[in-house]
Amino acid sequence: MAENFATFDDITYCGQEAEEIFVKNLYSSDLKGYGIRYMGGVKGKKQLMSGEVSDLYQAYSCPFSPKGKATLEESFIEPVKIKVNLEECYDSFWDTFMSKQTEITLNGGIPQTFFNWFFDNVMIQELKKEYEDLFWNADKAYTGDTREYLKLGDGIVKQLRGATGSTKVTGVALTVANVLDKIGEVAAKVDELENDVEGYKIFVNYKDYRKMLTALGENSPLTVAVWSNFTREGDKVYAYGMEVVPCRIDVNTIVASHPMNLILGYDVADSEIAYKIVDMRDKTMDNTFRVGIISNIAMGVVYPSTAVVTTAIA
């Protein structure tokens, strides 16, 4: 049993400390690395309105003669307040914790307390994964038995599939045999868009990305890094000039968009963000600890009409 190995002090991070933890993890997220646009201070439903102008030049004449077109597109972003309430037995993690701390000590390092280790190495890592999962895949109509947190809002994929202006490509179960063709089909739709597609990325699930690599390997001898319409530069693969990005988007889903078109909203100022870990042994006599976290997230798309998404598989 784990009890009596150590005396644990409860951990509470709130106010500025909690804000710093929250923001630090946001900016170390893979989403930031993808180039997703971050928008702070989203306290309530917020309108995202953007405009473009075109057809500006005309033949010179003396009088002022208005000419040109302005196109407005609006969408909304709304924050969702989320929380974590977790109770776990120390025994579930104690052996791993002791092994890690022994390794640290033998290497001349300073061992962590159990709560600090659990918070930094277990809790935060899982929170980052689920936060990214929410960003891409949240769906208020979700009915799955796992990942129930996806019901908390509507993520990027749900919003794009429901937007009248976005371009849809029929979704299929992606396999090694068809993944290159389906990525090519999405890329072809991007080329049909009227806007500048410089900087666009194609987002796919990690598993589908590996299928793509396998398919490329089957279509290329030796170590050639250039295929028909696909190239490799270092660790990155480009399809039709666009980087293919593996991420936590659901399997069999492809989204093509400029990453700055996709918004991750949040609020830290005057919010209720907090992180707490409480030892229950002196309170309930159970050999457990509780974790309580309050956070928030908002997802939005500025220009749905400039994005391409595969439809849900029927």
Please provide the spans of the model-predicted regions.
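Alpha-helical scaffold segments that mediate packing/assembly in large oligomeric complexes
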Residues: T102-E185, T310-A314
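Short helix/loop capping segments that flank catalytic or ligand/cofactor-binding pockets
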Residues: T96, E132, K211-L213
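Assembly/oligomerization interface modules of large self-assembling protein complexes
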Residues: A18-K100
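Ordered core of a single globular domain
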Residues: L174, L180-S220
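Active-site-proximal structural scaffolding
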Residues: L86, N116, I202-N205, T284
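Sequence/fold signature of self-assembling virion shell proteins
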Residues: A2-L56, L150-L174, K211-A314
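Extracellular structured ligand-interaction cores
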Residues: D120, V197-G199, T288
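Helix N-cap / beta->alpha transition motif
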Residues: N85-F93, K100, N205-D208, S257-P259, ...
